[in-house]
Structure formats: C-alpha cells, structure tokens
Amino acid sequence: MNPELFAETLSKYNFKLSPVQEQQFKTYFKELVRVNEHVNLTRITDEDEVYLKHFYDSVTPLLLWPEVFAEGAKLCDVGAGAGFPSLPIKILRPDLEVTIVDSLGKRLNFLSDLLEKLGIEGVNLVHGRAEDVGQNPDYREKFDLVTARAVARMSVLSEYCLPLAKVGGKFLALKGPRADEELEDAKSALEKLGGEVVFTRVITLPGSAEVRTLVLVDKVKATPGKYPRQAGTPNRKPL
C-alpha cells in the first residue's frame, strides 16, 4: 500500500487527508526508518509495508467504528512502542487527547522527537510499566478509551488496560488472526477486571493475506483495587 493508495482508501471512509496530514505520515515513515537503524522500533521498514501494516492497521478501528472515538475523548495507548495505534489515529483525529504508556525510554525519546517534527500537540508520554501506571491515581480509570496492539495475550492485556479505562469507557485490542482462543482464555480475567466483550471483528488488510481481529470491550464496573498486580505478575500468572 503506497502513500497514494493509503490516502485513497481512507477517503472511502470519509477521511480525506489534508496536505498537512499526508506530510505527517511521510515524515513519520522517514523518521521511523531513520531511527530504527540504532533503536529497535520495528522489523518492517519497506514503505508500502509500513503504510499497510503500521499506519493502515492502526487506523482500522477508527475507520470501522468511528462512533467509539467521541469528540475530544481521552485515549490511552498501552505499550505503543513506535506509536501504534495511537499516533496514526491522532493524525486523523487531532481533537483526541492521547496518553502513551511505554516502559522503554528510548522509544519514548523517539516519540517525543517525532511529535515535535510532526507539529502534534495533545500527546502525553508516560514512562512506566502498565501495572504501575494502572495503580497511579492520576491515570487509573481516567480514560474513555484504552488501546493496545500486539502487546500480550488477551488475559494479560486485560489486566494492563482495563484498570485505566473509566467505568462506561472502552478497551480496544488490535489482535492477530487467532483472537478467539485468546478470548476464551481471557473470560475469567475480563470478568474480574470489570470488562465485557461487546464486539469482535475479523478483517483482512487490503491487498494482502494479513488477518487482524479487533476486540471491543466495555468497562461495565470498577476494577477491584488489587488489580493490576505488581509488575511482571500478570504475565507470569494470568488471571
């Protein structure tokens, strides 16, 4: 998917890229590849692949479920790495207030420099483990929407993400092709953490065999105070 096809595909979903937005994606690609030479950000560096598997993949929830992204909503992206999915979403929807949580300082340094080059405001970068941030009263149950892409299996991911979503908010997981098995394993975790799966959608990225599953979870009740457990425990002992 080259930049032109990317723009054309978005326009079919009523997202017409402005020249500024087109340039932001071009700069994002150039900076990603440049910095990736000395900081491990991605295995994907071919332009067409970055536009498809990073940029387009990141914005698919916004294209398919625009109603989930309310005007001025507070979005938290857990383990965003090089900024996926939240920064491509933010480029399309500058009104969103975005917080990015990542445990690796080098990645956050990349994002900080990138945001300056892109001229993007309204993004808060938080250096820390999701388990610790989820117990911090500044962030706990403060977000309308929490996103995560390719971070951990669903039972673990739920404990990272649901404590950050406010009651009535949502948790959106961007998963691969075998999400059904993960969801089955995560039933107990979701129930304990106050989440309820409302929708899953399997999609294939355009012009490819890449299968993705979008999972939307409602935060129906408050997460008990003991969750998330201390750093490392959710991964070692999933709920």
From Swiss-Prot:
<keyword id="KW-0949">S-adenosyl-L-methionine</keyword>
<feature type="binding site">
    <location>
        <position position="149"/>
    </location>
    <ligand>
        <name>S-adenosyl-L-methionine</name>
    </ligand>
</feature>
<dbReference type="Pfam" id="PF02527">
    <property type="entry name" value="GidB"/>
</dbReference>
<keyword id="KW-0808">Transferase</keyword>
<dbReference type="InterPro" id="IPR029063">
    <property type="entry name" value="SAM-dependent_MTases_sf"/>
</dbReference>
<feature type="binding site">
    <location>
        <begin position="130"/>
        <end position="131"/>
    </location>
    <ligand>
        <name>S-adenosyl-L-methionine</name>
    </ligand>
</feature>
<keyword id="KW-0489">Methyltransferase</keyword>
<keyword id="KW-0963">Cytoplasm</keyword>
<dbReference type="GO" id="GO:0005829">
    <property type="term" value="C:cytosol"/>
</dbReference>
<dbReference type="InterPro" id="IPR003682">
    <property type="entry name" value="rRNA_ssu_MeTfrase_G"/>
</dbReference>
<dbReference type="GO" id="GO:0070043">
    <property type="term" value="F:rRNA (guanine-N7-)-methyltransferase activity"/>
</dbReference>
<comment type="similarity">
    <text>Belongs to the methyltransferase superfamily. RNA methyltransferase RsmG family.</text>
</comment>
<feature type="binding site">
    <location>
        <position position="84"/>
    </location>
    <ligand>
        <name>S-adenosyl-L-methionine</name>
    </ligand>
</feature>
<protein>
    <recommendedName>
        <fullName>Ribosomal RNA small subunit methyltransferase G</fullName>
        <ecNumber>2.1.1.-</ecNumber>
    </recommendedName>
</protein>
<comment type="function">
    <text>Specifically methylates the N7 position of a guanine in 16S rRNA.</text>
</comment>
<keyword id="KW-0698">rRNA processing</keyword>
<feature type="binding site">
    <location>
        <position position="79"/>
    </location>
    <ligand>
        <name>S-adenosyl-L-methionine</name>
    </ligand>
</feature>
